[in-house]
Regions:
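A short beta-strand-to-loop transition that corresponds to the Sensor-1 phosphate-sensing loop
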Residues: 48-52, 113-116
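Short catalytic/ligand-binding loop motif for oxyanion handling, primarily in non-cytosolic enzymes
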Residues: 53-59, 119-121
């Protein structure tokens, strides 16, 4: 919203700056939230906001490195503060908004996010038009392990070489016959081992299985029980048991 209503402004012959119409932004945001409320009148809205610190940077230092140096829109901080003060909201130390949502999502909740990564969380997901889609545990797991393989160029982590989003591998019997997390994880590890040479050539990776775990921890949207509230930190994913 802040980017949509940001304008260049000339303050002198040689000086330009940016300004944002916060009132326009608030109108947009409140309108969107009210529309969502109409779609789910029997639910209480809880906004999940990201914390300033992010545990993923310690796991993979190049995480979101492609976004560093990109200026946030003018007024972004003020809008965020206004939302936190005027709506029921949750911020958990050291994790992103997606993680807070994934941790809180229960069987009676509706999940709303435009981020495809949330499809790794089981539950009922709502679209902006009110349409509801249920993501089963199997679908959530399949989406997660697929993300571990494909990586995410927007978030700056590479995944496994030659396994893109549209790779034929995801239509193979090996993939489609996976039902347990152990099945998925063993198959994912196998793909990373097959890519040993390319991983070294492209990323100087000497331990493909360690790198696979690194990618999984970065890709993992935290689920219920995967956060240590006493110490304000996530419980790092360590593979299926």
């Amino acid at each position: 919203a802040s980017r949509r209503h940001e304008f260049e402004f000339q303050i002198s012959d040689y000086k330009w700056t940016y300004h944002t119409r916060i009132d326009y932004c608030l109108k947009d945001l409140v309108g969107q939230l009210e529309q969502l409320k109409k779609h789910a009148p029997n639910h209480t809205q809880v906004l999940c906001l990201g914390h300033k610190n992010n545990f993923r940077y310690a796991i993979y230092p190049r995480y979101k490195s492609n976004r560093r140096g990109i200026r946030k829109a003018a007024g972004y901080g003020a809008l965020r503060e206004w939302l936190a003060n005027n709506y029921e909201s949750v911020i958990l130390p050291n994790v992103e908004a997606d993680d807070a949502l994934g941790l809180m999502a229960g069987p009676d909740d509706l999940i709303y996010s435009k981020d495809k990564d949330l499809r790794t969380i089981k539950g009922v997901h709502m679209e902006s038009n009110g349409e509801l889609t249920e993501v089963t545990e199997l679908e959530a797991n399949r989406n997660f392990y697929k993300q571990v393989l494909t990586g995410d160029s927007c978030d700056g982590y590479p995944g496994c070489p030659n396994v893109g989003v549209n790779a034929k591998f995801f239509d193979s019997d090996d993939w489609l016959k996976c039902y347990t997390e152990i099945d998925f994880w063993q198959l994912v590890q196998g793909q990373y081992l097959l890519a040993t040479k390319k991983l070294f050539d492209r990323h100087q990776v000497t331990d493909p299985l360690k790198f696979a775990l690194q990618m999984a921890r970065v890709a993992r949207i935290l689920r219920p029980g995967e956060y240590d509230h006493e110490n304000d930190k996530p419980v790092l994913w360590d593979g299926p048991s």
